């Protein structure tokens, strides 16, 4: 019994070192930031203070490319659940983006890379690319897939994607 107690104490001590937080990749924004939002017809863009003009650019681009991107997959972003897609802008990180479905959101890392020049503006490339991932994940919200969502929630999209 004493050995079991020591093993439990050691495991409780080591667990924080091996555990990963939910927002590990995107949680490195400075804690002092104040966050604001802009709502479009289909998206809610959440952005840090001081980047409102950049947020308007991204909001306009993801809204503008919503239908052209959906023509290649057959699904519109926001189709199926009727909620606006949260788009979280991270203006102080690297150049990248990601789409997660549990919780549902699109993360945009808006700082363009100085070492990887693109033929199109970074805001356009990022908006189109991440919008494509959103429409691909809409497949899990179709009528045929709803029973799976009853059991696994938003995690069902991960299984079907």
Regions found by a protein language model. Give the residues of each.
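Absolute protein N-terminus
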Residues: 1, 21-22
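Short, flexible, solvent-exposed loop/turn segments with mixed acidic/basic and small polar residues
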Residues: 4, 14, 75-76
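Juxtacatalytic substrate-recognition/specificity segment
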Residues: 23-161
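Bacterial N-terminal signal peptides that target proteins for export
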Residues: 1-11
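N-terminal signal peptide c-region/cleavage motif recognized by signal peptidases
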Residues: 16-18
């Amino acid at each position: 019994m004493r050995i079991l107690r020591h093993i439990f104490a050691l495991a409780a001590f080591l667990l924080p070192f091996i555990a990963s937080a939910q927002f590990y990749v995107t949680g490195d924004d400075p804690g002092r930031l104040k966050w604001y939002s802009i709502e479009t017809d289909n998206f809610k863009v959440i952005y840090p203070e001081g980047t409102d003009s950049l947020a308007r650019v991204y909001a306009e681009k993801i809204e503008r490319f919503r239908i052209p991107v959906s023509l290649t997959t057959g699904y519109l972003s926001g189709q199926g659940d009727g909620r606006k897609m949260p788009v979280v802008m991270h203006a102080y990180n690297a150049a990248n983006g990601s789409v997660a479905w549990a919780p549902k959101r699109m993360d945009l890392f808006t700082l363009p890379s100085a070492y990887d020049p693109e033929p199109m503006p970074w805001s356009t490339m990022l908006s189109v690319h991440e919008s494509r991932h959103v429409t691909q994940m809409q497949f899990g919200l179709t009528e045929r897939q709803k029973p799976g969502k009853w059991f696994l929630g938003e995690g069902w999209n991960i299984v079907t994607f």
